[in-house]
Amino acid sequence: MTSKEDGKAAPGEERRRSPLDHLPPPANSNKPLTPFSIEDILNKPSVRRSYSLCGAAHLLAAADKHAPGGLPLAGRALLSQTSPLCALEELASKTFKGLEVSVLQAAEGRDGMTIFGQRQTPKKRRKSRTAFTNHQIYELEKRFLYQKYLSPADRDQIAQQLGLTNAQVITWFQNRRAKLKRDLEEMKADVESAKKLGPSGQMDIVALAELEQNSEASGGGGGGGCGRAKSRPGSPALPPGAPQAPGGGPLQLSPASPLTDQRASSQDCSEDEEDEEIDVDD
């Protein structure tokens, strides 16, 4: 009796069960079924697989560079099965590497450019100046007094005599001619400025020169009475303490007076000194 009742009750329970109870359980019950999610649309598992294939392809390519003997067939098959995404990634990496190299080269090229786009001219290295000895300068100056331009034979002779090179002799004579030209231009400018001043300005200059001469003579630095300052033309200079005229002006001296004789001797002494400054022996 009990077995029959149980058999009758079992079909009734089966009727009361929901039809969902007969469905198989999902493979992953924790993950919800979302067929329209972003991951399902983009097929994320395949993307991960392509990334893994790309990494393997890069490793195999590096191994191919270091070991040219060849790769196994499995590795070459893996390289041939890379996805288009892997190829795109490799192409992008090569492109960016090329851009980085070009940017670095352009930056290095801009270092040599100025703000206005003009390339900096390299500074010329100055040659070291030749230090001439006193004997060499004396011999060169002595030769320059009567010969401003040298012939090749004279140049070789001077260079051999003084222990210099031909280039050093040529350079010294060029610089000396330029210095002489500057000195002549300065003297010419001084003469022109003196002419513009007029007689009064020239008289003032002569008076200042006489004052300097008298101060040197009183201080004991006159060099034995031989001064280099020029006297005023037409009126001999009077030493300190000379007698004056009653009106307060300087006393006019006769040509035969002792003061005029002293002035004439001082002029002769100055001329002798100027003649002795340059002594040239050919």
Curated annotation (Swiss-Prot):
**Gene encoding it?**
Lbx1
Q: Where is the composition biased (Acidic residues)?
A: 269-282
Q: Give the GO terms filed under biological process for this record.
A: cell population proliferation; glutamatergic neuron differentiation; heart looping; muscle organ development; negative regulation of cell population proliferation; negative regulation of glutamatergic neuron differentiation; neuron fate commitment; neuron fate determination
What is this protein's record name?
Transcription factor LBX1
- Signal recorded as keyword: no
GO CC terms on record?
nucleus; transcription regulator complex
Q: Which CDD domains match?
A: homeodomain
Which residues lie within the region annotated Disordered?
1-36, 210-282
Cross-referenced Pfam families: Homeodomain
Tissue specificity field: Expressed in the dorsal part of the spinal cord and hindbrain and in presumptive myogenic cells in lateral regions of differentiating somites.
Q: State where the protein is found.
A: Nucleus
The keyword Nucleus appears for this protein: yes
Q: Which domain of life is it from?
A: Eukaryota
| Assembly and oligomerization | Interacts with SKOR1 which acts as a transcriptional corepressor.
Q: Where is the composition biased (Gly residues)?
A: 218-227
Q: Which residues bind DNA?
A: 125-184
Under the heading SUPFAM superfamilies, the entry gives:
Homeodomain-like (SSF46689)
Effect of deleting the gene: Death at birth. Mice fail to expand their lungs and do not move their abnormally thin limbs.
Q: What this chain does, per the record?
A: Transcription factor required for the development of GABAergic interneurons in the dorsal horn of the spinal cord and migration and further development of hypaxial muscle precursor cells for limb muscles, diaphragm and hypoglossal cord.
Query: Tell me, what is one Gene Ontology molecular-function annotation carried by this entry?
Result: DNA-binding transcription factor activity, RNA polymerase II-specific
Main subcellular localisation: nucleus
Sorted alphabetically, which InterPro entries does this protein's record hold? HD (IPR001356), Homeobox_CS (IPR017970), Homeodomain-like_sf (IPR009057), HTH_motif (IPR000047), LBX_TF (IPR051892)
Keywords, ordered alphabetically: Developmental protein, Differentiation, DNA-binding, Homeobox, Myogenesis, Neurogenesis, Nucleus, Transcription, Transcription regulation
- Where composition is biased (Basic and acidic residues), the residues are 1-20
